[in-house]
Amino acid sequence: MFELNNFDALQIGLASPEKIREWSRGEVKKPETINYRTLKPERDGLFCERIFGPMKDWECHCGKYKRIRYKGIVCDRCGVEVTKAKVRRERMGHIELAAPVSHIWYFKGIPSRMGLILDMSPRALEKVLYFASYVVLDPKETPLLKKQLLNEKEYRESIDKYGDDSFVAAMGAEAVKTLLDEIDLEQSSIELKEELKTSTGQKKIRIIRRLEVVESFRKSGNRPDWMVIDVIPVIPPDLRPMVQLDGGRFATSDLNDLYRRVINRNNRLKKLLDLGAPDIIVRNEKRMLQEAVDALIDNGRRGRPVTGPGNRPLKSLSDMLKGKQGRFRQNLLGKRVDYSGRSVIVVGPELKMYQCGLPKEMALELFKPFVMKKLVQNGLAHNIKSAKRMVERVQPQVWDVLEEVISDHPVLLNRAPTLHRLGIQAFQPVLVEGRAIKLHPLVCTAYNADFDGDQMAVHVPLSVEAQAEARFLMLAAHNILKPSDGKPVSVPTQDMVLGSYYLTMDKDGVKGEGKVFSCPEEVLMAYQCKAVDIHAKIKVRLKKVIDGETIEGIIETTPGKIIFNESIPQDLGYIDRTIPENKLKLEVDFLVSKKTLGGIITKCYMKHGATKTSIMLDKIKAKGYHYSTIGAITISTSDMVVPESKRELLENTEKQVEKIQKMYRRGFISEEERYEKVIDLWTKTTEDVANALMESLDSFNPIYMMADSGARGSKSQIKQLAGMRGLMANPSGKILELPIKASFREGLDVLEYFISTHGARKGNADTALKTADSGYLTRRLVDVSQDVIVRQEDCGTEEGYEVSEIKEGNEVIEPLVERLSGRYPSEDIIHPTTGEVIVKRNTYMDEDIAQKVSDAGIKKVKIRSVFTCKSKHGVCARCYGMNMGTSQKIHIGEAVGIVAAQSIGEPGTQLTMRTFHTGGVAGADITQGLPRVEELFEARKPKGLAIVSEVSGTVKMEETKKKRTIIVVTDDGEEVSYDIPFGSRIKVKNGDIISAGDEITEGSINPHDILRIKGVDGVKNYLLSEVQKVYRLQGVDINDKHLEVVIRQMTRKIKIEDSGDTELLPGTMIDVFDFEEANREILEKGGEPAVGRIALLGITKAALATDSFLSAASFQETTRVLTDAAIKGKIDPLLGLKENVIIGKLIPAGTGMTRYRSIQINTDDENIEEDSMDSMEV
């Protein structure tokens, strides 16, 4: 039996008239919808019950048969089958057209498929279809040509000249249908291939296009004449509903209006034909019918759209699929789910890392069926119905049952926008009073949540499998690392950091300094009795049992550090425990800031795993809050101390500025230089004031503590509060030379305030724009890489990708260690001096090994990379390396494509929107930030192009009055010269040796040039390092492998240049692996292989070029994708995630992969692995 969800692929094609009649349950003959008096559908109308099924369950139209017992009977009076009303969602009808009409998608799309296959221009075709010209179908003996157009006058003249039956010419879709019918696809294909061999230029391009369409029809088994419609399918009435409003009026779907126009015109045409009306009237009616069908299929594609009341264009069938509100994105990819709720969030500092507070009433509603089942099980209710009543009346015993149900049932919390996979995590719910969800403070960073009114959604995983996945994979306590760079995401923030910082400070000359205590417990007692200050330097005798022997000794520390170290495992590697005198030292014996806390968490995670780390985090959280409260660290204006040296510094600078102005007035320096110098002076002064300020602040100054610990604020903010605000930019980004000399503490005057507002407003406008742009970039990234899944352990490739550190000038942007850790080398790494093998090929390198390689002085290493992975679909685990989110080796089934897209898209909002203005008249604006990332991923020609050397060789410079020229001399003496426009900065010097693809002037390079000069490896390298530069400059770390995944998708297609003996068409794009496959097959038969070269596609193009038409159609340009797919009879193999979500199957990643599908889960055993919650209750 065919199960609706049990198929492996999906094919799309053109529907033949026979097929449409086969789908249909009857012909719709009348434009009537519903009788407004009886509110019953009219017979043979658009809502007819005889065609589409009954309006009410088990009830025919006339009421002769009611109730389920007559199931399946067709009423003899009204002809309605007695069945469920749901069939009105699936039964189709049809309209028999009195004259054929063309399908607008195939006639009007770009390129016009109908025009290509007939070799007519779309313009000529339009004249024929809309009855403006005749087309010659059969010239017989006359000198006319086949497919020649004749207007009314020429047609009459030809008839007079050659006689009535001397030739055949016609107009309208009938004529086109006849022409399409006559096409012999096999013959056309052979002729076009012959022509292709001899043609060049524009003609060649046109032939390739035509050949593509002809081949599509030939291979798919679609017939060209099916592009002309004889029968129109009518979609089921419940998909185009009509409902009665309060006032007795009806609201209806636009489709009904469009269908009604088609039926009206069709019926009128039938009548005219029966009456034998004059040709001109019939012709006009046929044209109107053609236009009505066009509007139904795609309103507004040709001519003015048909409008409804209030001049609103009606929504046609195409509009139902298109865009954010269309079927694909609104209903198939974005479904609403049951068992969910949302509420405002408040902070829950008392929660454990894996808990969240769930409001009682919300929990009761969410877990209703579970509670009802439990009530019956516990004998508190006799049946489900009475249990339901108990829950709805909220009787007291319901709450105890709810507690029981909830105790081992995780829930998912989600905050929109979900920018990365940490935007949905699982928690163990704890019932709370009130109506707000309580959230653990440490997961706020991952959700990017704060408590100023944010809302979050709750979802309940229902099945046992879903609960298990939520508990073992999605529990917040297991998601401590960020998938984008493997650094911890649950780092304490704000108060917690401040409290930890305060605890680990020390101070001279406070109460109890120098005292000696017999044990840590005594220190705590002394502190609680206020006999010793928390920051006092004291000595304590410690005892420890190590390997069975007891060691004791005295260490110097503070009470605060003892308290802080209680919650830290004492073996994180901060202290070398092999040295005897270090054995008793406290692990964290330094001032703790946000940065060092991050380090402590990383070390703990690497050494002890997630469970222990989350326990440690909870302890740090509790201590941090407690001591930042006790420490009473708070801000007041008296903490903002204006440095005394400020006035003197300002006066000095003003004198120097005056000197510079004098020099300018005397003509010693240019306007440019004067501006540069003034800006430099003020920048330096601002710095000096800031430094003076930082020096003058006491280390116990609350504002200083907040900034220094990383809890809130930064040096630049303190500088503005108590130093001076400094230079400001105007909206276009130019720096004004009038600095703001005041600080906020002193107060700004009117002019200063006005200058400040400029920047502030631009910042706000920028942020709003950036969010939208960043979201759209993420969407495109997800679409291009969504089908990349780890599908095998090892693809067996011998190739590798050479990495070295990424530099910008002299500054290292990404060190080698970072590029190596978590990877496999593709060849043995040998120590350059000792010659020993440090790492064998295909051996996993962790951070320590990577550090070893780097320390050995090795600069370049060949590693296994996603770039060189040979897996046809997805990637293999070896080429991918480490899973950044768990710092383990990646598992098969991990959706690495989506993780990559999220990792690149999520920090998008942090990137700036700005364009830097470099000095100089012709100084090109260098794009940076988000626009630069977008430019790279879309493989666009960048603004501010650099000149690139096409050849390798030595640089020779020549300068004349008119122009500057750079000549590159190759090794065999050939010279290539480049003219340098004025205003561009040259990057090379005379006598430099450069290689092909190096830039001669500053600026960005067009990636397509790099592909041409340096090949595909060069362009991959360039894109990777350029994107990394943008992100690193903003302080965002993204692991290379995420960028590799996306860039690999951009370089997967080959453009065929010569087809050889293969079936491939020149000029078409084909997947690298399919190309190699086709060539392998031809070579085995002894034929000539195809020749092609790698094409670099931007992410939008690459996403549309995917094998899956469902994924492409749901992304962009829906109609174009579907038109193309239908002609080609494309088969969607359902390999990606999106297409499976669309048709409602499990996604082929994680436990949804086919290899896990057949696993049976036995649920009789109640304790699934001693519930992971208990193990965390340590």
Curated annotation (Swiss-Prot):
Q: Which domain of life is it from?
A: Bacteria
Provide the cofactor list for this protein. Answer: Mg(2+); Zn(2+)
Q: Which InterPro entries match?
A: DNA-dir_RpoC_beta_prime, DNA-dir_RpoC_beta_prime_bact, RNA_pol_asu, RNA_pol_N, RNA_pol_Rpb1_1, RNA_pol_Rpb1_3, RNA_pol_Rpb1_3_sf, RNA_pol_Rpb1_4
Any one cellular-component term (Gene Ontology):
DNA-directed RNA polymerase complex
Biological process GO terms, please?
Answer: DNA-templated transcription
| Swiss-Prot/TrEMBL catalytic activity | RNA(n) + a ribonucleoside 5'-triphosphate = RNA(n+1) + diphosphate
Could you say which residues bind Zn(2+) 1 here? C60, C62, C75, C78
User: Pfam families attached here?
Assistant: RNA_pol_Rpb1_1, RNA_pol_Rpb1_2, RNA_pol_Rpb1_3, RNA_pol_Rpb1_4, RNA_pol_Rpb1_5
- So where does Mg(2+) get bound? D450, D452, D454
Q: Which GO terms describe its molecular function?
A: DNA binding; DNA-directed RNA polymerase activity; magnesium ion binding; zinc ion binding
The protein's matches in SUPFAM superfamilies, at most eight in alphabetical order, are given as: beta and beta-prime subunits of DNA dependent RNA-polymerase
Family membership noted in the UniProt record? Belongs to the RNA polymerase beta' chain family.
Q: Subunit structure, per the record?
A: The RNAP catalytic core consists of 2 alpha, 1 beta, 1 beta' and 1 omega subunit. When a sigma factor is associated with the core the holoenzyme is formed, which can initiate transcription.
Q: What HAMAP family does the entry give?
A: RNApol_bact_RpoC
Q: What does this protein do?
A: DNA-dependent RNA polymerase catalyzes the transcription of DNA into RNA using the four ribonucleoside triphosphates as substrates.
State the name under which the record lists this protein: DNA-directed RNA polymerase subunit beta'
State the species of origin.
Clostridium botulinum (strain Langeland / NCTC 10281 / Type F)
The protein's gene is named rpoC
